[in-house]
């Protein structure tokens, strides 16, 4: 499951957009 990196990036992006 190499989606951990994507999830981290997505979470970071979400926080930035907030």
Swiss-Prot record:
Q: Keyword Lyase: yes or no?
A: no
Q: Which domain of life is it from?
A: Bacteria
Tell me, what is one Gene Ontology molecular-function annotation carried by this entry? rRNA binding
Please give an example of a GO cellular component term from this record: ribosome
Question: What keywords tag this UniProt record?
Answer: Ribonucleoprotein, Ribosomal protein, RNA-binding, rRNA-binding
What this chain does, per the entry, is described as:
One of two assembly initiator proteins, it binds directly to the 5'-end of the 23S rRNA, where it nucleates assembly of the 50S subunit. One of the proteins that surrounds the polypeptide exit tunnel on the outside of the subunit.
Family the entry assigns: Belongs to the universal ribosomal protein uL24 family.
Subunit and interaction comment: Part of the 50S ribosomal subunit.
Mind telling me what this protein is named? Large ribosomal subunit protein uL24
Lineage of this protein's species?
Answer: Bacteria, Pseudomonadati, Pseudomonadota, Gammaproteobacteria, Enterobacterales
Point out the gene that encodes the protein.
Answer: rplX
